[in-house]
Amino acid sequence: MGPCETCHAGCCRSFAVPLTGADILRIERELRLDFWQFACRWADPHGKIARNHAPHFRFSDDPRTPFVVCLMHAESHFLDGTTKCRFLMECAPDESHSRGVARCGIYGSRPGACRAFPMALDDTGELVVLRDVPPRGRVGHDPAYELCPRPWEPADVDPLFAVQDLVVVAHEMSFFRRLAEVWNRRPQSWLVFPDFLRLVYANRVLRQRGEPVEFDDEFVPAFGSDEESLRSAA
């Protein structure tokens, strides 16, 4: 039995889950949800969410604040005064499980950050390393934010899918960081950000014509300097 089987999902309660553009478009497509139904921006002035991994985005309505694009949180139905991932499905606590058991409501479409936890690729990029999980995901003493009920073991991880997931996660986050560099040169309103994402990813597949295409402002030829151009392009 894996660590998640009887867990209350402390990780899904403790952390703001960073998204990539691919995560966002997959959730929109597969679950038929709109961006505004599941995505939000989390202010991250000290880098505690990005952790030198997810990119920071700047927006014209608050240009001094670095934000990370994440899944929304909502109030827990059973653990008063705590929050959880918007997609976490909770069961009521019982005698065997004082904090209940919880499951991901979008497991097949879950973001790359969720697929990767608590793993990483080694320095060669060929092997999976299990990271040590701390006892708690947030400061304080609320048991809702306690993490895995036992240490992870290699037998808990699928040796095929884990490597594949981690390689894709690394690639998509790298692409998203480059996308953030382009966006941050001319930050626009948060309100047009999903249109920008759809525009970029719609142009992600190209027919090769001579020299390779560099990922810069020219990669998104319709990306103008004002919000109206973004809306019309998308």
Regions found by a protein language model. Name each.
Residues 1-234:
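Short loop/turn segments that flank or connect secondary-structure elements
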